[in-house]
Design a protein with these regions (language model features):
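Asp-based, Mg2+/Mn2+-dependent phosphohydrolase catalytic module
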Residues: 2-6, 10-16, 23, 28, ...
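Acidic-and-aromatic substrate-binding clefts and catalytic sites of carbohydrate-active enzymes
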Residues: 15-19, 45-46
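Structural recognition of the conserved hydrophobic beta-strand(s) that form the central parallel beta-sheet
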Residues: 37-39
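Conserved phosphate/oxyanion-binding catalytic-loop motifs
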Residues: 42
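Active-site donor-binding segments of glycosyltransferases and PAPS-dependent sulfotransferases
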Residues: 72-76
Length: 256
């Protein structure tokens, strides 16, 4: 049974094309009836639209096997006035699903990935947090890779805000317990006996995905096709990573 990341794992961070072996891996899981759930920290496009873009790329993801933060956000905070910090696509999608941008009197601060954050943005987030507005990270990705650059991920930014203000933050997507539990419930629709210990999670993000999964007793597989390459593995916590592969084609070769 598998949890499988998307960016840097199934599709390239640079041109969004399927990574070597990605389509074949999904096809094999489908044909062999191996339970899986695609788990992504997508925060730019509505869930159904993003799933369709993946299918259009040749990833034959079956129904009931996809989860992103938008799928579970309503359980954490229902549509209301919020201060949205992130890419324009994130702000627009949040408004499309019923949330209202309000930086003067928000019920919560929501932070998503972006490569254009300024210190003025961080100052505003700090000021709101110090007024008692709760902080919600859309996920806890460690690094946001875009155009070949490695920007601080949402998890890193939320941790910085927490450190500077003393305010704690909650997380919607990976690696939060709530998100992984929701993914497990989807997996149980394929195999009612599924437990975390039965799952192998495949991702390119050791800190943002795999370390938290390991704490839940999942097996962890790091792929070097995204945020981390062979030259930057020195700082990995190898106690929390069971296997390292160049890309998902190596896992497909084992399964086929």
């Amino acid at each position: 049974m598998y949890f499988i990341d998307v960016q840097g794992t199934l599709i390239s961070d640079s041109d969004k094309s399927p990574i070597n072996g990605a389509c074949e891996l999904i096809d094999t899981l489908n044909s062999k009836l191996i339970p899986y759930v695609i788990i992504t920290n997508n925060t730019k496009i509505k869930s159904d639209e993003f799933l369709q873009t993946l299918r259009d790329k040749g990833l034959a993801i079956k129904d009931g096997a996809y989860l992103d933060p938008f799928c579970v956000l309503n359980e954490i905070i229902s549509p209301c006035n919020v201060a949205l910090f992130g890419a324009k696509e994130f702000v627009q999608t949040m408004q499309d699903i019923g949330y209202t941008q309000d930086i003067k009197d928000p019920k919560a601060i929501l932070i998503a990935s972006w490569d254009k954050f300024s210190f003025d943005d961080f100052a505003l987030i700090n000021e709101l947090a110090l007024k008692g507005v709760k902080i919600i990270a859309m996920h806890e990705t460690s690094i946001y890779k875009k155009n070949g650059r490695l920007y601080p991920g949402v998890g890193a930014i939320a941790s910085m805000i927490s450190y500077s203000t003393g305010a704690k933050f909650s997380s919607v997507g990976k690696p939060s317990l709530g998100f992984y539990t929701a993914a497990l419930e989807l997996l149980k629709q394929q195999n009612p006996k599924a437990e975390f210990k039965d799952i192998t999670i495949i991702s390119d993000d050791a800190t943002g995905d795999l370390y938290g999964a390991k704490e839940l007793n999942m097996s962890t597989a790091l792929v070097l096709s995204g945020k981390i390459d062979k030259s930057s593995t020195a700082n990995l916590n190898r106690d929390k990573i069971d296997n390292i592969y160049d890309d998902v084609s190596k896992i497909w070769e084992i399964l086929r």
